[in-house]
UniProtKB/Swiss-Prot annotation:
This is Apolipoprotein D. APOD occurs in the macromolecular complex with lecithin-transport and binding of bilin. Appears to be able to transport a variety of ligands in a number of different contexts. GO terms for biological process: brain development; glucose metabolic process; lipid metabolic process; lipid transport; negative regulation of cytokine production involved in inflammatory response; negative regulation of focal adhesion assembly; negative regulation of lipoprotein lipid oxidation; negative regulation of monocyte chemotactic protein-1 production. Pfam families: Lipocalin. The lineage of its organism: Eukaryota, Metazoa, Chordata, Craniata, Vertebrata. Belongs to the calycin superfamily. Lipocalin family. The gene is APOD. Keywords: Disulfide bond, Glycoprotein, Lipid-binding, Pyrrolidone carboxylic acid, Secreted, Signal, Transport. Residues 1-20 form the signal peptide. The modification Pyrrolidone carboxylic acid is found at Q21.
Length: 189
């Protein structure tokens, strides 16, 4: 018990340092994912509309492009426009996490890092997608990541509300979500 008590102040400091990120007591929730998910319909370019802020995304004009690799996995290319006008890009690979639930993927960007969950909670493939990721930290806390994506840089407010309602109905907080700036983005991205 004493080691846990010593660990709590350190974790509190860590959580305070991760401004905007969503840390919560307890293990990750397990919301239902998109039924009959078809990865082939999901491929292509998506624009980030809103998200729970994450330390690894600081820019604007954030977008993701998904394509099928020869091995059957999904190539992930994420891009953002930095404040200095340069484009930051990262490439990763998504693999099925559970063959019976194809909307549950695991994405990995660096060989030395563990994979992270990438769960598609909802999509109509042509307009919107709702993506959820959660990591449990030493059985005491969990950290949420949420992305609302669109095939176009903007979604109607009623669509965003619909997607946020899915989150809140599954006890996933949306209060920290922020709108991603998609104004004056270079076409070359």
């Amino acid at each position: 018990m004493v080691p846990v008590l010593l660990l709590l102040p350190a974790l509190a400091g860590l959580f305070g340092a991760a401004e905007g990120q969503a840390f919560h007591l307890g293990k990750c929730p397990h919301p239902p994912v998109q039924e009959n998910f078809d990865v082939n319909k999901y491929l292509g370019k998506w624009y980030e509309i809103e998200k729970i802020p994450v330390s690894f995304e600081k820019g604007s004009c954030i977008q993701a492009n998904y394509s099928l690799k020869e091995n059957g996995n999904v190539e992930v290319i994420n891009k953002e426009l930095r404040a200095d006008g340069t484009v930051n890009q990262i490439e990763g690979e998504a693999t099925p996490e559970n063959i019976t639930e194809p909307a549950k993927l695991a994405v990995k960007f660096f060989w030395f890092m563990p994979s992270a969950p990438y769960w598609v909670l909802a999509t109509d493939y042509e307009n919107y997608a709702l993506v959820y990721s959660c990591t449990t930290i030493i059985w005491l806390f969990h950290m949420d990541h949420v992305w609302i994506l669109g095939r176009n840089p903007y979604l109607p407010p009623e669509t965003v509300t619909y997607l946020k309602d899915i989150l809140t109905s599954n006890n996933i907080e949306v209060e920290k979500m922020t709108i991603t700036d998609q104004v004056n983005c270079p076409e070359s991205m």
